[in-house]
Amino acid sequence: MSNLQSLKADLLKLPFADKSVQSLSCMHVIEHIGLGRYGDEIDPCGDIKAIKELKRVLAFHGDLLFVVPIGKAKIMFNAHRIYSYEQIISYFPEFDLKEFSLVPDLHTKYGFIKNATKEIADQQNYGCGCFWFQRKTCNLD
């Protein structure tokens, strides 16, 4: 890919202007931020700060593919967070949820569940929640 340029960036300080990025994906990163496992500083709100930064740079009508562990909300010491479905939805009020899919705990039995429900997500211990959000046209953030 001759036009590909790879850069290093800090998810807490992305090098993009406000509302300038049309498409973002953040897959299995947020749950680790602020827990110190990968050399980052301990910050109990690190994940929320990173989410705020993703929201800052995503353009109107922009798409965000956001993947995190889903189940009963908790922090696994020095490893990762597990989020409830409702937690993730509450973090993105200025976005429309276009699709939610799930790789459940029993993925060998159930496989990939496209258009999974909140109820199925709530039954997981450590499912893989795949959210497709789209920023609404106008908001007050």
Give the ranges of each region predicted by the language model.
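Class I SAM-dependent methyltransferase SAM/SAH-binding core
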Residues: 1-14
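Acceptor-substrate binding/catalytic loop of class I
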Residues: 45, 66, 71-91
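A conserved beta-strand element that flanks and buttresses the S-adenosyl-L-methionine
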Residues: 25, 30, 34
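A short acidic, Gly/Pro-enriched loop at the edge of an enzyme's catalytic core
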Residues: 12-24
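A short glycine-rich, Lys/Arg-flanked "PGG" loop and its adjoining helix->strand segment in the class I
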Residues: 42-63
